[in-house]
Amino acid sequence: MKFQLHRTDGLARRGTLSLTHGVVETPAFMPVGTYGAVKTMSPADLQVINAHIVLGNTFHLWLRPGLQVIEAHGGLHRFMGWDGPILTDSGGFQVFSLGVLRKITEQGVKFKSPVNGDTCFLTPEESMRIQYVLNSDIVMIFDECTPYPADERAVGESMELSLRWAERSRQAHDEGGNRNGLFGIVQGGMYEKLRDESLAGLLDIGFDGYAIGGLSVGEPKADMRRILRHTAPGLPAGKPRYLMGVGTPADIVDAVAQGMDMFDCVLPTRNARNGWLYTRTGVIKLRNSQYRLDTRPADEQCTCYTCRHFSRAYLHHLQRTGEILGARLNTLHNLYYYQQLMGEIRTAIENGQFQEYAQAFQAQTAS
């Protein structure tokens, strides 16, 4: 894995991330393919919208279809028919989401499988082994996603456990012979001091890239931005920086301004299935009756397949009748919008005009 930083504009960064299965231009947005598929999208669709990299989920793929199936295909790329780069989350967030169904110990996490009720045990070593079989281009360490809200003592204990797991993840990754990139994850909740301690510990271990985790878990937007502004400047300048699970287009523009390079979020695909379309002037909610006779495309400035061929009225009709095509067309549009956004951001940074772009973007989407 190799990261090249080409240009900065303020704190915003323009780079190139060279991975085993291809090159990712940064800043980049990664569509989420939890089970090895971005919902309603084929790999060919993802290429058309210019997605450079997709995200898969270690936890869910481990449970279903299981490692035996994926290993028989030689890894996740061939299994899902995608020949570009893949980043896999370690499973820490999904285990966190199980709540009372899981028990955390120093060794790892014991939980009941949401698929069949079997007792499962996931450790840093097992997470690294799974991701080695998946052959993901970027592997995430196994960590504990700190719940929100939580007091400083509880968050501190969680962060320290994640650091110990980070060291075990690094060791297992290296001893297993995995040559793909391994990213550390900064935790520490809403406490700047704990975030600093987490980052210092990760830097001592040493990783190929660094992520900010534990945000977008229910905290107020102001707290998310406060922690981002505090943590991002301390991340190594020569390594890729990944903000996990964030977010809206406005969140991404704001995070790029703080120096972040990589993003993932389910919002564009989930909202598409619910009839919410992102446009240059804000969000369209297709179920609203105001679109019943609207012959305009969803976004008159958009050149995606959906906007070139279909009206808001037709998309409204598909949403109202529950047609599967509606979810597909909406997803095509939203992911195209996100990829176009990232392309515009990259161009603005290259031209030294990112601040002006960000101001114009925020003004336009707020109007």
Curated annotation (Swiss-Prot):
Task: Identify which residues the record assigns to the active site.
Answer: 89 (proton acceptor), 264 (nucleophile)
Q: Which residues bind substrate?
A: 89-93, 143, 187, 214
Q: Which Pfam families match?
A: TGT
GO biological process annotations for this chain's record? queuosine biosynthetic process; tRNA wobble guanine modification; tRNA-guanine transglycosylation
Q: Which cofactor does it need?
A: Zn(2+)
> Which GO terms fall under molecular function for this chain's record?
metal ion binding; tRNA-guanosine(34) queuine transglycosylase activity
Quaternary context: Homodimer. Within each dimer, one monomer is responsible for RNA recognition and catalysis, while the other monomer binds to the replacement base PreQ1.
Record-given protein name = Queuine tRNA-ribosyltransferase
To which species is this protein native?
Answer: Nitrosospira multiformis (strain ATCC 25196 / NCIMB 11849 / C 71)
User: Taxonomic classification, please?
Assistant: Bacteria, Pseudomonadati, Pseudomonadota, Betaproteobacteria, Nitrosomonadales
